Amino acid sequence: RIGDADSEQLAIVVNAGMALGEGELYGFITYSGRDNTSGAFYRNPAGSGAALDDGENVVVDGFLPLINSEIDDFSYNLGYRVDFDDNSAFDVSYTYGRNSIDYTTSNSANYSFANELNFGQGLTDAEIRAQIPREAFAYGIELGLQTINFDYTTSVGDIFLALGAELREDTYTITAGDEYSYRDYDTDEAGQGIYPQNASGGIQGFPGVSPSSAADESRNVISFYADAEYQVTDAFLLNGAIRYDDYDGFGDTTNFKLAGNLRVTDNFRLRGAASTGFRAPSMQQLYFSNISTQFIGGVQVETGTFRNDSQLARAIGIPELKEEESTNLSLGAVVDISDRWNIAVDFYKIEIDDRIVISNNLGFGLSDALDAALISAGASGGQFFLNAIDTETDGVDIVSTFGDINVLGGDMTVTFAANFTNTDITRIFSNSPALAPIPPEQIFGGFQPSVIETWQPEDRISLSGNWSRDNWTAHVALQRYGEYTTEDEGPQTYGAEILTDLRVSYEFDNGLSVFASGINIFDVVPDEVTNSSSRGGSFESAAGLEDMFSPTVFRYSRRSAPFGFNGAYWSVGATFSF
C-alpha cells in the first residue's frame, strides 16, 4: 500500500465572546479527531525465523502489517481584555492544549512468539496459527501545554510600549504498548537464543514501546517581554524588544530585537532588523526513546533511539541537550511605483548554532568507548538527539502587488511573490569523547545533511490574482517550485514544476456562501524516482522462489515531495454565517 494513509477526520471549532464590565470575555474550543491506516513493508513468508513443523511460516502466505493511528487534538482558551480611554489595554488569558496519538499494529505477528508456542509450549501447527495474535497496541504519546498570559499596552509620550508575561507548563507522556507488541520471546535476558531457531522480537511492521521507554515528563517555563516603538521623526520609526525565558530544564536565555523603518521619500522606504533568538529542545527530543527494527543500508538490525539523558548517552559522554541559538539580520526596501503598484524586496541571513539533529545509527567498530557502551545497553546500534550542527541561511523575498484592475466589470488585484533561499551546514561536531574519533559524516551524514540543505527547492515563485464583482469572487494562482535534490541510494535532482490552483465562490444575501475549487488542476506530479532499488522489488514464495517482480514499488520519492504526488484535487463546499 503506497501513498497517503486512509483517513477519517472530524473537526469542531467554537468561538465565543461577550461584553463583561468594561471589557470583553472571550474564548474558543477546538477539537479534531482523525483515524489513519497505512501499510508497512510486506513480510514475505521466507526467512522469518519462525517456520513451523510443516516447514511453512506461521503466516503461510506472508502479510502486510497495517499501522493504525488514532489522533486527537483538543484545546480551549478563556480570556478577558479591556481597552481603556487613555490608549492603553490589557489582556489576560488561559490556554490549554493537548495532542495524543495511539498506535495499533494489525494484520501482523510477533514471529518470536510463534517459536515460544512451538518449542516452549509444544503446541501443534494448527494451534499456533489459531492462537497467535495478529494485532497489538504499540504505544501512545501525548504532548500537552497550558499557559497563563498577561499582556499590557500603553503609550508614554511618543513611545508605544507593550509588556507581557507568560507561565507555561509542557507535558509529555509515552504509554507502553502491549507486551506482545515489543517482547522477544525466544531470547533470554543475556540476548542469547533459547530455541532451535531465532526470530525478530516485537510485532512486525511497527513494534511497540516497552515499559523501560515509557515516560511521564513535564517542565515549567516563565517568560517576560518588553517591546517599545518610537517615532523618532516623521520619517523614521524605531522598534526594540527584549525577551527573557527561564526553563527549569536547562536554564535561562535573553534575546533582543532592533528594527527600523526609514521613509526616504514619499514613495521609497528602507527597513531593517537585527535580532537574536533561541529554540528550546522539544519534549520529544528530550524524552523519546525506543528499541526497534530499522533498515540501515538495506540490512535489518535491532537498534535503539536513546534519550539524551540515558545511561548509554552518559557512558558515551553525550552532553545534555541545550537550546539552539540564532542570529537574524534583514534589510529591505519598499517602492510605491504608483497608487496601484508597489514592490518590496527583503534580504535576510539566519545563523543557527547548536542545532538539534538526530544522529546516524551509530554501531560497533566506530570507537572503543562506543562499543563498550552499546554492549552494556544490549543494543547493536544507537541514535541520539544531539546539538551537533551549525547552519547558515541566506535568502531574498520579493513581493509586488498591482491592484484596482478592471476585468469583466469587477476589480482584480495581481500579486507576484518570489523566495530564493539557500541553507548550508557550516559545522558538524559531537562534543563527546567517545564520538570524537568518528568522522563527522558518520555521526550526521548519508542523506541526513541533504534534508536540511537540498530537500526543498531553493526558489519558489507565485503569480496570483484575486477578482471580485458583486457577490462573486475568484482566485487563481500559479506556483513554481524550483529544482531540489534528494539522497537515497544516490543523489537525484528533480525538475522544477508549475502548479495551478483555482477557486470560485458566490455569497448569497442570507449568509450562505458556496464555492468550487481545484488544487493543482492540471494534475502535475514530480519526476519519478530513478536511482533507488526501492523503486522495484520482488515477492518470494516460502521456498524462496520469485513469484512476481514489480518495477514501480515506489514511483515517486518517499524522501521528499514539496507539492506531493497525488495530482489534482477538486472540491465543492458551503459555509453559513449567522
Identify what each model region corresponds to.
Residues 1-40, 44-61, 65-88, 95, ...:
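Transmembrane beta-barrel wall of Gram-negative outer-membrane proteins
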Residues 422-423, 478-485, 506-578:
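C-terminal beta-signal and adjacent terminal beta-strands/loops
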Residues 7-9, 205, 209-221, 267, ...:
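Outer-membrane beta-barrel signature, preferentially recognizing the C-terminal barrel domain
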Residues 10, 20-22, 31-35, 84, ...:
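Transmembrane beta-strands of outer-membrane beta-barrel pores
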Residues 163, 342-488:
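Gram-negative outer-membrane beta-barrel transporters
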